[in-house]
Regions:
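Sec-dependent N-terminal signal peptides of Gram-positive bacterial secreted proteins and lipoproteins
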Residues: 4-30
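Active-site-proximal helix/loop segments of hydrolytic enzymes
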Residues: 32-44, 67, 71-252
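Short glycine-rich His-centered loop
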Residues: 42-66
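Pro/Thr/Ser/Gly-rich low-complexity, intrinsically disordered linker/stalk tracts
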Residues: 246-275, 309
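Hydrophobic core positions of the immunoglobulin-like beta-sandwich fold
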Residues: 270, 302-305
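Solvent-exposed loop/turn segments flanking beta-strands in beta-repeat/beta-sandwich domains
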Residues: 271-290
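Beta-strand-rich modules
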Residues: 279, 304-317
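Short beta-strand segments within Ig-like beta-sandwich modules, predominantly Fibronectin type-III
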Residues: 292-299
Length: 317
């Protein structure tokens, strides 16, 4: 399971600066060239619009308008996908993009085939008690594969925060254990919901987002009535997911030609990225697995005085 991206509200492009050494140029000299580095593996999010085809989900009529859950879920998911794809470092898939039926097992199997880091089932709620209203997010329990549960809980909280900000009643983040005593291989209680349980077996968190109650007049007419209001829900989901993964909007600083100074230090410069609170400069020896953070700055330039002639380095900003 992929860990959270560690760059938040800062420049999100990888840039390579090679300090070319012995064998290519005379010893003792420092030479610099800037190139675009290979992209890091993206975060993979699979959105699952609930129901579809013959499975309509909840269906209620208010003030002469019929609210069909399967249609609402799909509209919210499409907006969420569009919004998420504005961020750098994320790949988004949907289990269905039209009005068709997909089994619960195939929904999770699809996510597994795409090597998902997070599975988000998009739903709306219903109750026999028509006064019930508000939003909640279900996440995996803390038993079997505890890290899946803890990551899912954090992702759920991030999404729920955004939904609450829209004015929906905050019904919190919840988990639900099997009602029939089912157990995981380690004998801990199994999750109740199939997509959450199957996702845990597959190794990634599965969430169910219940946006609003189709069975409640005010929820339906205030939050589910029309494309603009459904888009707000999709944007809220995307914002919550982006904040959980620390994604940034897909804007990249452009590295100017590096300057090798007389003292053999190297000066980097890049353009301003709107919305970036700061920039982090990382360096590693070419071919090494890990980067070392050199500096965190609000400026759009940095001079590295720690380079050694004869060594190749790679930088990220």
């Amino acid at each position: 399971m992929k860990k959270k991206v560690q760059m938040k509200k800062m420049a999100g492009v990888f840039l390579t600066l090679a300090i070319l050494g012995i064998g290519l140029f005379p010893p003792g000299n420092v030479y610099a060239a800037a190139n675009q580095a290979p992209d890091a593996d993206p975060v993979v999010v699979v959105l699952d619009p609930g129901h579809g085809g013959h499975d309509q989900g909840a269906r209620y009529k208010w003030d002469g308008k019929t609210y069909k859950e399967k249609q609402l879920n799909l509209a919210i998911a499409k907006t969420c996908k569009t919004e998420l794809e504005k961020y750098a470092g994320v790949k988004v898939y949907m289990t269905r993009s039209s009005d068709r039926f997909v089994t619960l097992g195939n929904r999770v199997n699809f996510a597994k085939s795409r090597k998902a880091d997070l599975f988000v089932a998009i739903h709306n709620n219903a109750s026999l008690k028509k006064t019930d209203h508000g939003a909640c997010v279900y996440y995996p329990n803390s038993g079997y594969k505890e890290e899946v549960g803890s990551e899912g809980k954090m992702a759920a909280a991030s999404i729920q925060k955004q939904l609450g900000a829209l004015g929906l009643k905050n019904n919190g983040i919840l988990y639900r254990n099997s009602a029939v005593g089912a157990r995981y291989p380690d004998k801990s209680k199994a999750d109740y919901y199939a997509v959450i349980k199957r996702s845990k077996y597959a190794g990634f968190p599965g969430l169910i987002v219940e946006h609003a109650y189709v069975s409640n007049h005010d929820d339906s007419t205030t939050f589910l009535n029309g494309n603009d209001r459904l888009k707000r829900l999709g944007v809220a989901d995307a914002t919550g997911i982006a904040e959980y993964f620390d994604l940034i909007l897909d804007q990249a600083p452009v590295l100017q030609t590096p300057v090798v100074n007389a003292d053999e230090s190297v000066t980097l410069a890049w353009n301003t990225v709107q919305g970036a609170d700061y920039y982090r400069i990382y360096r590693r020896i070419a071919g090494a697995k890990t980067y070392v953070c050199l500096e965190e700055t609000e400026e759009t330039g940095y001079t590295d005085t720690g380079v050694m002639p004869g060594t190749s380095y790679e930088y990220t900003v």
